[in-house]
UniProtKB/Swiss-Prot annotation:
Keywords: DNA damage, DNA recombination, DNA repair, Metal-binding, Zinc, Zinc-finger. May play a role in DNA repair. It seems to be involved in an RecBC-independent recombinational process of DNA repair. It may act with RecF and RecO. One of its GO terms (biological process) is DNA recombination. This is Recombination protein RecR. The gene is recR. Belongs to the RecR family. One of its GO terms (molecular function) is zinc ion binding. Residues 81-176 form the Toprim domain. Coiled coil: none annotated. InterPro entries: DNA_Rcmb_RecR, Rcmb_RecR, Rcmb_RecR_Znf, TOPRIM_dom, TOPRIM_RecR. It comes from Pasteurella multocida (strain Pm70). A zinc finger (C4-type) spans 57-72. SUPFAM superfamilies: Recombination protein RecR.
Length: 200
């Protein structure tokens, strides 16, 4: 059966979303056309507006509609002296939801991966270095992912910080709350032992 070129284009466009394969994209397209045309129109409007108006903060590189995001513009955070380095803008959202961090951020938009052609320049480490030189931070907290690439990225940034005599720490990685030891992989368990804290 030959389908409409517009329908085919819609299905193909939906496939750009993470985790959406041909079948899922087809289900979404048919759902919007059959049962939720208003929702589809609203989605199209929201996508168009977001794509044209959302850019990157000139200080931390997270997503924002302004030149400088609300976190970087917050005077209380400007005087905290803390900078948290994350891989993705979504990492900021996750950290903010904990309510445990009151400093500022720098978003790498990825991690070092030489095999994929991603070096220091591609993740903006020259911008991070400039920021460390121009602003007064007394501690940089590295919140990169606990992967080989995340570790390599954290080690590279740690060197930059130490060259400027800035204290550098890495968020702890270990056993999740409610997790059972027998289900935890060896690398995570090793991190848990290395990152153990004294009680009392």
């Amino acid at each position: 059966m030959q389908t409409s070129p517009l329908l085919e284009h819609l299905i193909e466009s939906l496939r750009c979303l993470p985790g959406v394969g041909p079948k899922s994209a087809q289900r979404m397209a048919y759902h919007l056309l059959q049962r939720n045309r208003n929702g589809g129109m609203e989605l199209a409007r929201a996508l168009t507006e977001a794509m044209s108006k959302i850019g990157h903060c000139s200080h931390c590189r997270t997503f924002t509609e302004e030149e400088v995001c609300t976190i970087c513009n917050n005077p209380r955070r400007q005087h905290s002296g803390l900078l948290c380095v994350v891989e993705q803008p979504s990492d900021i959202q996750a950290i903010e939801q904990t309510g445990q961090f009151s400093g500022r951020y720098f978003v790498l938009m990825g991690h070092l991966s030489p095999l994929d052609g991603i070096g220091p320049k591609e993740i903006g480490l020259h911008l991070l270095q400039k920021r460390l030189q121009e602003e007064s931070f007394h501690e940089v907290i590295l919140a990169t992912n606990p992967t080989v690439e995340g570790d390599a990225t954290a080690n590279y940034i740690a060197e930059l910080c130490m060259q400027q005599n800035i204290k550098v720490t890495r968020i702890a990685h270990g056993i999740p709350v409610g997790g059972e030891l027998e289900m935890v992989d060896g690398t995570t368990l090793t991190h848990s032992f290395l990152g153990r804290r004294q009680l009392g």
